[in-house]
Amino acid sequence: MATLNYEITTSGGVRAVDPETGAEVATCPATGTMVVQLLRPASGVIVREAYYHYPRARSNVYYLDSQLKEVWRAERPSASDAYVSAGWLGNGVLRCATWECWTCDIDSASGRILRKVFTK
């Protein structure tokens, strides 16, 4: 099978689509609010959900494998924080900013914080 395409659904979740056939391979609903950003590592997809009203018990940035099964959730600098932006820094590292003014470099293989800087 070719590398899958990932899209945000009209209901705010994620779907995986076979680019050759257009067939939907898998779907995953949002886990707290709605999906607002998708980032593509070598396989699978990294998802960021809207932070506003996201349940603070868990991270709003997470990695789904090619079948849209959750593999990890990004570590947060504090238990109450949420990610407001995410982008590729390079070499498998995400750079994410949080609501509580942290900039975090996150390992895309594990979701662990590699470095964090207070930026307020």
Regions found by a protein language model. Name each.
Residues 1-9, 15, 41-55, 89-98:
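Short beta-strand elements that form the blades of beta-propeller/WD-repeat-like
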Residues 2-4, 29-43, 48, 76-89, ...:
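Repeated scaffold domains used in trafficking and secretory/extracellular systems
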Residues 12-32, 63, 67-78, 114-118:
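Aromatic (tryptophan-biased) beta-strands that constitute blades/sheets of beta-rich domains
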Residues 18, 39-40, 107:
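Acidic/polar residues at beta-strand termini and the immediately following turn/coil
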Residues 45-46, 59, 66:
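Long, charged/polar, surface-exposed segments that mediate recognition or autoinhibition
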Residues 59-62, 102:
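A short loop-to-beta-strand structural motif that recurs across blades of beta-propeller domains
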Residues 77-120:
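Short, compact, well-ordered microdomains
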